[in-house]
């Protein structure tokens, strides 16, 4: 009985879309979590492969699955997760976790997060992960680089599917989502927003060196591992378009960080602002190679960013 009283309750928020190929295996790995009590809340972007029907049937026999009303069209994972954050009742839960539809969780994923968060007095958690491909290739992806002064405005803490948020962080984040204006839907990455909110408002965050899950790579991934030259150049083109810094500005506004010097003098400073950021690259990204690319990107934007996109 004493052991049962120590079990913590986790609300797992899963966004699905045409997920029949991998979804069942993923949900089964979530339901096998050890030493914790879970409830999986699922929001399905309007699908055509029978995802809704399969989940509805499954929920009849599995009380740990809660399905949000079907029928809405979100058009991306971000808006779907915002719907979950807005609509799921988090009262009575100790932690919130995000889940994609096509990965595989380690049986102790949530338990390990809870233990490390308690040890480090952290309220936000993310971790390394293992990317794997249909060919059988697997690769550990390290996200546990030291946090920097402003990294939260330029990158997430890792994939949202590794995140665990204590309720004292999750509930204020939920209030932000519920109260946000239409600009929320312009932020494509719910995980980046969550990390920025936590860091700016001084909620302690820990990034675990342990790989908590297997992150499936396939042709239909909305966001995958940056592997291969094609993927690399797609990201370079997105950087040079100014897209990343536009996302940074939106996030800074939503989390009320717009008064920071990195926003006022850097992101809001036009071409000179990009040079200002370039000189502070080590404070804007965690990983050394990313700091180098950040520096190069800022210099290129200062030189070549089209004037008709504005200074932002």
Task: Label the model's feature ranges.
Residues 93-102:
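Short beta-strand-to-loop acidic/aromatic patch adjacent to the donor-nucleotide binding site
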């Amino acid at each position: 009985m004493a052991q049962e009283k120590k079990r913590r309750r986790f609300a797992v928020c899963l966004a699905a879309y045409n997920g029949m190929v991998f979804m069942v295996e993923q949900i089964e790995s979530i339901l096998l979590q050890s030493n914790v009590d879970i409830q999986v809340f699922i929001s399905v972007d309007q699908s055509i492969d029978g995802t809704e029907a399969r989940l509805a049937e499954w929920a009849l026999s599995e009380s740990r699955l809660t399905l949000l009303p079907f029928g809405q069209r979100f058009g991306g994972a971000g808006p779907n997760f915002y719907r979950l954050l807005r609509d799921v009742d988090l009262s009575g839960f100790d932690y919130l976790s995000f889940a994609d539809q096509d990965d595989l969780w380690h049986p102790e994923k949530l338990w390990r997060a809870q233990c490390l968060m308690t040890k480090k007095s952290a309220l936000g958690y993310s971790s390394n992960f293992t990317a794997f491909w249909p060919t059988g290739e697997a690769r550990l992806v390290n996200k546990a680089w030291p946090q920097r002064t402003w990294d939260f405005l330029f990158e997430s803490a890792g994939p949202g599917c590794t995140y665990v948020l204590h309720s004292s962080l999750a509930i204020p984040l939920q209030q932000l989502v519920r109260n946000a204006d239409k600009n929320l839907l312009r932020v494509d990455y719910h995980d980046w927003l969550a990390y920025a909110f936590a860091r700016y408002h001084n909620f302690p965050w820990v990034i675990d060196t342990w790989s908590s899950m297997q992150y499936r790579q396939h042709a239909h991934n909305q966001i995958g591992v940056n592997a291969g030259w094609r993927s690399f150049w797609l990201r370079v083109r997105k950087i040079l378009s100014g897209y990343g810094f536009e996302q940074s500005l939106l996030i800074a506004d939503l989390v009320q960080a717009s008064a920071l010097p990195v926003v006022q003098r850097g992101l809001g400073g036009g071409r000179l602002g990009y040079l200002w950021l370039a000189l502070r690259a080590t404070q804007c990204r965690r990983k050394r190679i990313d700091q180098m690319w950040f520096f190069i990107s800022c210099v290129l934007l200062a030189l070549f960013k089209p004037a008709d996109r504005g200074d932002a």
